[in-house]
Amino acid sequence: MSEGPIRVAPHPIAKRVKHGCKTPHVSHIDDYRSQHRETIGHESDKWWAKKAHELLYWDRPFHTVRSGSFENGDIAWFPEGGLNASYNCVDRWAFKHPEKTAIIYEADEPGEGREISYAELLREVCSIANVLKSFGVKKGDTVSVYLPMTWQAVAAFLACARIGAIHSVVFAGFSAEALRDRMQDCKSRVLITSDEGRRGGKAIATKAIADAALKECPAVEKVLVLKRTGNPVPWTEGRDVWWHEAVARVPRYCPPEVMASEDPLFILYTSGSTGKPKGVVHTTGGYLLCAALTVKYVFDVHPDDRFACMADVGWITGHTYIVYGPLAIGATTTVFESTPVYPTPSRYWETVEKYKLTQFYSAPTAIRLLRRLGHEHVNKHDLSSLRVLGSVGEPINPEAWHWYNEHVGKTECAIVDTFWQTETGSIVVTPFPGAIETKPGAATVPFFGIEPAILEPTTGKVLEGNDVEGVLTIAHPWPSIARTIYGDHQRYLETYMKPYPGYFYTGDGAARDEDGYIWIKGRVDDVINVSGHRLSTAEIESALITHTGVAETAVIGTADELTGQAVYAFVTLKPEFKFDAENEAGLSKELILQVRKIIGPFAAPKRIYIVSDLPKTRSGKIMRRILRKIVAGEADQLGDLSTFADPGIVEVIKEKVASAA
């Protein structure tokens, strides 16, 4: 973590939100403060009960708003209540305005997408629910979903929820081994997949990968296969069933199963420090409420808005902000099958212009990539429909923030740099469009019901006031907090509740600046201690990326005999940057001086490696853990690399580090 207080001037509230045709849901900072106090005060249950009734339909009323504690790991919200997530996300709106667009499906190839109405979505959801019932799936069973980014993936989620089955969605870029492990762990009886997927003009062999995984999953009795491309695929008679053929044989309506608020809605696997994925369990009532609340308030979504989250449904961002959040409030959501650069770097902006999207939610990795490719791809499109721009996945560096603001938002859109995790279920720290001025790189303020506590890492003491930095925790339960790790509640308690008793441990460092804004400083294990100076890797990376030639960076700490730890940086360069490989030492010196100038001599990297790419997962997350192991001489302990976008880059980096030793 950095030394000294954070000093950044705020940007004014965005013109298109403050002076637009729609009044913001939270229109002044005093309104935010008043509501936030209400949601964490002694009578906060009244606020939560009111919102639960406003935003959700309950088949069975609740009398208790919340019970349980972090210490006991027995948190529950609206426990007597009964509802169905599918009914809340589809039926309500299909009955009210059947022809309204529920899903904008932008297919991989431009021109092949279409819009799906709430009425059509209801028919498809009910049909798939009946197919699952014909397979013998019942309430409490687990169904694995391994689908590409088609609109039918959304229908699969909601079909499971409709009959009380628990869905376990696996990102369609994961390997057969990763899929196998997840299906075995959650004891799936049915898998939903496709013949193939399409992304960036390339085919993804989903069915072939699924078949390889199924060789070691004898408990899976049925495989429902969506025909996406129509290409020949391996087939097991008696087990495999075509989606379109199954749908034709079942009734077009399926009554929703009333679920207890605390019944599991889904299991989603996330990486664990031990290497074994954790099956994070989210329940129905509390999760759905926070999904709806955050879409409405964080993105200022109104009934006729067209919301676009560019994530994959295989991640929590897709679960909450493609599927459950937008549909729970009756908005139009977007399923984007392609990549930001296929067939050209204008693809995102063509999509915004074509559908007149009003909110756009993407990741810093994509924003940095598009910035690197030039703003001319943005400037030729009409993006005037946009009001709110979102960022998710990691803190957005100021350079990317400014580019996003100036070239995509034309300095008139609100930018919400959101912080949350798979385990939190929904956004927990964020700006509020229309109410709060923003600072580039700041996560800003807690969402309703969230009471962050910044603790001194060693003692666990709460650091009060502003200009403090420590470990980020949350002081009280909120509705969408994960309830357990599937099959291992003890691991859940030890990971999140035991490190700082009485608080939920996020695993991230944070600072609160002079204005009370919260800044996420990266994972606690991404903090480097150099001669007693605690440095944030994110801050060093931001300093490096201000160099005109730098595209992306990844900074790690490694053991050093003299200073305890030393800073090592891996850097990729922009394609247009003229670089003589013979002068790598000269460029490295420039970059070191850049960090010394921006942060201070204590933050200067000891070694900089210029590389062609960084090790990333298919979702774009940079795997700094891999870089740490390579530098530490533990390259034989890297584990499974099958989830990487380009596993070959690891070998290239290993050779680079070895040759520089």
Curated annotation (Swiss-Prot):
It catalyses: acetate + ATP + CoA = acetyl-CoA + AMP + diphosphate. The keyword Nucleotide-binding applies. One of its GO terms (cellular component) is cytosol. It holds the Pfam family ACAS_N. ATP binds at residues 393-395, 417-422, 508, 523, 534. Its EC number is 6.2.1.1. GO terms for molecular function: acetate-CoA ligase activity; AMP binding; ATP binding. GO terms for biological process: acetyl-CoA biosynthetic process from acetate. CoA binds at residues 199-202, 317, 531, 596. Keywords: ATP-binding, Ligase, Nucleotide-binding. InterPro entries: Ac_CoA_lig, ACAS_N, AMP-bd_C, AMP-bd_C_sf, AMP-binding_CS, AMP-dep_synth/lig_dom, ANL_N_sf. SUPFAM superfamilies: Acetyl-CoA synthetase-like. It comes from the Eukaryota. NCBIfam families: Ac_CoA_lig_AcsA, PRK00174.1. Belongs to the ATP-dependent AMP-binding enzyme family. PANTHER family: ACETYL-COENZYME A SYNTHETASE, ACETYL-COENZYME A SYNTHETASE 1. This is Acetyl-coenzyme A synthetase.
